[in-house]
Each structure stands twice: as C-alpha cells, then as structure tokens.
Amino acid sequence: MKLESLHKLWIHELKDLHSAETQILETLPRMVAAASHDELKMALAEHLQETRTHVSRLEKIFKSLDFSASGQRCKGMEGLLEEGRALLED
C-alpha cells in the first residue's frame, strides 16, 4: 500500500493500533485465567481494562473522522500474541 500523504499514513497507523489493541482484547482473558500468581493475574486484569479503554478511545476517534477502524490486521501484534498463546499451551 503506497501512502501518499501524512493523513493517509496517520489513518493507516490508527488502524494498525486499533487492530493491535483488539487482538490483545481477544487474548488477555485467557492469559488472566491461566495466570497462577495473584499479582500477575491482577496486573493482566488491569491491563485488560486499560486495553478496553484504548479500543473505546480509538473507536471514538474513527467515528469523529468518519472512517472505519476495520480492514487492517496488525501483523506484529499477531506474532507476539501467537508466541503468548504457545506459552499458555506448554
């Protein structure tokens, strides 16, 4: 995808960020459930709530810009979360 302006780059990066945060939302509940240490469980649960807030804010930004947040998948976060899921299975 050729980005021809700073505005298009900004929208692209916002979509990438939204995708990353949404992917985290899909995985964190399993990580919270799998955590055996109380402090880790609490930290992950707190991060889950913060991530929900991030997604909500990003969706408000997209709504105010009259753009859709969908249509892009953050490959970097996808890889990181795949590693995390593999650790949960071990």
Language-model segments: residues:
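Amphipathic alpha-helical hairpins
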Residues: 1-90
